[in-house]
Amino acid sequence: MDYLDKYKFSCDNPEEFGIDIKKYKKQNVLDESHISDLLSHSIRITKDILPKVSKSINRVFEKLEIENQFNFFVTADSFQANAACSLISLSSKPDIILTSKLIELLSAKELEFVIGHEVAHYVYQHAMYPNYQNEENRNLKLNILNLSRAAEISCDRIGFLACGD
C-alpha cells in the first residue's frame, strides 16, 4: 500500500487536529447496523450479473496497482446515488456497497472514481476515525469535521487516480 500512501493528504492524520483515535475505538455501531441493513438487501457484483460494473472494478485495481481484496455489492435504491465501504463484513474481506441508482446514473469513468474513493477509505483506515456526532466538545467536534474533510481529500485523490487514463 506504500504506493497509495504518497497521495494521502498531509492533514489526513488525527494527530494534526489533536484527536486521539484510541479514545473513539469501536464507536461506529450505528454505521455498522446501517451497513448490515444495506447488505441484507444487496447482491454480490459478479461479471455474470453486472459485467460493466465488474469491468470497472477490475480496471480500478489495475490502475491502483493493488490486489482486489473486497466484496462488492449493489443494493436496490431507486432514489439515492450512494456508495459505502464497510470494515465489518460477511467474510474476511471488506465490503463496498453501491446503490442501483448510482450505477444507473454514472458513466464507467465516474463509477471508477467512486470505487477508487471507497477503496481509499479502507486503505487509509478512515473507519477508525471518530464521528463528530458523538462528540460534545465543540472544539473537538470542529476538529473531527476538519479531519473528515481531509480524509475526503485523500480519497478523492485516489478516486482521480482510479479513473484516470
Language model feature labels by segment:
Residues 60, 121-122, 158, 162:
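Short alpha-helical functional segments enriched in proximate histidine and acidic residues
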